[in-house]
Amino acid sequence: VPFAKLGKKQRHQISLVPQDFAFYPLLTVWENLKFFASLYDVRDKGYLLELLAKVDLTSHKNKLAKHLSGGLKRRLNFAIGLINRPIVIFLDEITVGIDPQSRQFILDSVAALKEQGVTVIYTSHYLQEIEQLCDKLVLLNEGNLIYQGSVQGILEEEQSLERFYLDFLNQAGNTC
């Protein structure tokens, strides 16, 4: 079913955290959360405060978003994606360009979402993250599907996803 044909309730159960920041840099962290909450008709201030704590931004609540570090901006982007309590969330390159501590924080948060039963669709070029987080995998090369199946299936035959992908590229005559 095309997204546009879903009802409002179904659309509000799906969330996207894009690679590019999707917040307003001239608003504070708190103002951004309140604005995006209003789009989903979320009025529970307590929930927004919990969300701030969940992404470890409580102490940055009153900072302008543009003054946050890259890792904190990723956390704000992630928090905005969680405002609507999605049952399906698309995470596009969510750990690109951030420090190791923020990266691990986000990976742990994504793992917690999975444990809560949220369906996570995770795009990444970091194959180690995929090994760590994902059950199923779709690999694309230049827009073409090259693998669809379980991560475990690849790991049983190969040493790593990197080895699988590099072997595929070599067989196809591509080089890195």
Regions found by a protein language model. Name each.
Residues 34, 38, 43-60:
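Conserved ABC ATPase "signature" region
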Residues 64-71:
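Conserved ABC ATPase signature
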Residues 89-92:
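Catalytic Walker B motif of ABC-type/P-loop ATPase nucleotide-binding domains
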Residues 130-132:
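A short, surface-exposed alpha-helical micro-motif characterized by mixed small hydrophobic
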Residues 148-149:
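ABC ATPase "signature
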